[in-house]
Design a protein with these regions (language model features):
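Short, structured active-site "lid" loops
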Residues: 47-74
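Short, well-ordered beta-strand segments
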Residues: 6-8, 75, 93, 126, ...
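Short acidic active-site motifs
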Residues: 62-63, 115, 154-155
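Paired acidic/hydrophobic, glycine-rich loop segments that form the ligand-binding mouth/hinge
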Residues: 56, 73-77, 165-170
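Small-molecule-sensing regulatory modules
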Residues: 2-39, 44-48, 52, 138, ...
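A conserved helix-loop-strand patch within extracytoplasmic ligand-binding domains
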Residues: 79-82, 88-142
Length: 318
């Protein structure tokens, strides 16, 4: 390729770090690239909870629009930010080898403790995620959840300054930024589940681009792709997004893999969980199977409750 590939990315420190990981992988294949940066709707509207903004693709739409127009050649995303239904003309061609998918607890240095159990009653725990909120309250209903927006360094600063006593963040972001020292403990599956696709970097391209598509696909990590396909199928089958407390994680075992999933109401008073064997030959089918299992165990009632509370739009006819 003569001209450098144009890589669309958000302009946050973490997003740039992830885009540079892709740049380095391309350079190993002798391919030069340059970054084209964006501020998305989710980056601009920091004074509102994510769940109330309501738009799909809060952190991805602007990148996708320009990719479709040919203003960039590929886009790099945190896979958990990508809606499960791709815009017409775009595909996720590759996911890189996954970082640690777990969430972590970050405690203010003035609090003595090594886990959620050690937080004093009434402690303020920061998160902007309904999934994290629900799991936190299901574990410790005596804690207060505080809205915490901003990039990773901003959220860490708010913990250090004591605006909140603790925060829950993605391990992958802290690892990629070299901020391991802030981690108090990891929140392990299946007791605590991350977002579908968490920890995976996605490369999105135009589906008819015969020049860039093969290059992007050469970066794909197959085990990660199989895992996240199952997780995202589970999410899609439950009609989930940032407005629904849903978690999913595919975990390799000695004999294959397990797919864990959960859905909760916003208050954390009701949580439905399930685990099935993951069929690596049909990962999407495994995700749908687990979603159907949870629907039969109470997930449908949770979704209907969220709709009545106006957290969700009405289901669309098929």
């Amino acid at each position: 390729m003569s001209a450098p590939l144009r890589i669309g990315t958000r302009s946050s420190e973490l997003a740039l770090r992830q885009a540079r990981i892709v740049q380095a992988a391309l350079l190993e294949r002798g391919i030069e690239s340059e970054l084209v940066t964006y501020r998305t709707l989710g980056d601009k509207r920091l004074d509102e909870p994510l769940s109330t903004i309501g738009a799909k693709g809060l952190f991805t739409k602007e990148l996708e629009v320009d990719l479709r127009k040919g203003k960039t050649d590929l886009a790099v995303h945190s896979l958990k930010d990508l809606p499960t239904d791709s815009p017409p003309g775009l595909i996720v061609a590759a996911v890189l080898e996954r970082e640690d998918p777990r969430d972590v607890l970050v405690l203010n240095r003035g609090i003595m403790g090594q886990s959620l159990d050690d937080l004093p009653r009434g402690s303020r725990v920061g998160t902007s995620s309904l999934r994290r909120r629900a799991q936190l309250l299901a574990t410790r209903a005596d804690l207060e959840v505080a809205e915490l927006r901003g990039n990773v360094p901003t959220r860490l600063k708010k913990v250090d300054e004591g605006r909140v006593h603790a925060a829950i963040l993605a391990a992958a972001g802290l690892h990629r930024l070299g901020a391991h020292q802030h981690i108090t403990c990891y929140l392990d599956a299946p007791a605590w589940l991350p977002a579908a696709g968490q920890g995976a970097i996605a490369i999105q391209v135009r589906d008819d681009d015969d020049r860039v598509g093969p290059v992007a696909r050469s970066l794909n990590d197959l085990p990660t792709m199989l895992a996240v396909r199952a997780e995202r199928a589970f999410l899609q089958a439950l009609e989930g997004g940032c407005q629904v407390p849903i978690g999913a994680l595919a975990v390799p075992t000695d004999h294959g893999a397990l797919l864990h999933g959960m859905i909760a109401d916003v208050s954390g008073s009701r949580v439905v969980r399930g685990t099935i064997d993951l069929d690596v030959g049909e990962p999407e089918l495994s995700g749908v199977r687990l979603a159907n299992q949870l629907r039969g165990e109470g997930a449908s009632e949770i979704l209907e409750g969220l709709r009545r509370a106006e957290h969700l739009p009405a289901p669309q006819p098929e």
